[in-house]
Amino acid sequence: MSELEKAMVALIDVFHQYSGREGDKHKLKKSELKELINNELSHFLEEIKEQEVVDKVMETLDEDGDGECDFQEFMAFVSMVTTACHEFFEHE
């Protein structure tokens, strides 16, 4: 398996490690998203302690307005964070 394919499998695995703990196994609730960000993105994003921050992140991601983050919305978030990190490291 190529490095890119391994990365894709890892993204899918991480999403499903957190989704469905509290409901729909194909979506992240706010608490699941917060835990995922704090555990899996701690080197790129500061730990989220304030509920208002989680609410704002979810509001931005939740394109269909169902109050949860599906895989497509999660991938849009990962893409935004990855792009921001790429731009940061490119200028170092």
Curated annotation (Swiss-Prot):
Q: Where in the cell is it found?
A: Cytoplasm; Nucleus; Secreted
Induction remark:
Up-regulated in periinfarct ventricular myocardium.
Keywords, sorted A to Z: Acetylation, Calcium, Cell adhesion, Cytoplasm, Metal-binding, Nucleus, Repeat, Secreted, Zinc
Q: Where does Ca(2+) 1 bind?
A: S19, E22, K27, E32
Q: Which GO terms describe its molecular function?
A: calcium ion binding; calcium-dependent protein binding; identical protein binding; protein homodimerization activity; RAGE receptor binding; S100 protein binding; signaling receptor binding; tau protein binding
Summarize where Ca(2+) 2 binds, as residue positions: D62, D64, D66, E68, E73
> In its keyword annotation, does this UniProt entry include Protease?
no
Q: Which residues carry this modification: N-acetylserine?
A: S2
Residues at which Zn(2+) binds: H16, H26, H86, H91
Annotated EF-hand domain ranges read 13-48, 49-84
- Enumerate the InterPro entries for this protein: EF-hand-dom_pair, EF_Hand_1_Ca_BS, EF_hand_dom, S100-B, S100/CaBP7/8-like_CS, S100_Ca-bd_sub
Give the consequence of mutating H16A.
Decreased zinc-binding
Q: Which GO terms describe its cellular component?
A: ciliary basal body; cytoplasm; cytosol; extracellular region; extracellular space; neuronal cell body; nucleoplasm; nucleus
Q: What does this protein do?
A: Small zinc- and- and calcium-binding protein that is highly expressed in astrocytes and constitutes one of the most abundant soluble proteins in brain. Weakly binds calcium but binds zinc very tightly-distinct binding sites with different affinities exist for both ions on each monomer. Physiological concentrations of potassium ion antagonize the binding of both divalent cations, especially affecting high-affinity calcium-binding sites. Acts as a neurotrophic factor that promotes astrocytosis and axonal proliferation.
Q: How does it assemble?
A: Dimer of either two alpha chains, or two beta chains, or one alpha and one beta chain. The S100B dimer binds two molecules of STK38. Interacts with CACYBP in a calcium-dependent manner. Interacts with ATAD3A; this interaction probably occurs in the cytosol prior to ATAD3A mitochondrial targeting. Interacts with S100A6. The S100B dimer interacts with two molecules of CAPZA1. Interacts with AGER. Interacts with PPP5C (via TPR repeats); the interaction is calcium-dependent and modulates PPP5C activity. Interacts with TPPP; this interaction inhibits TPPP dimerization.
What protein name applies here?
Protein S100-B
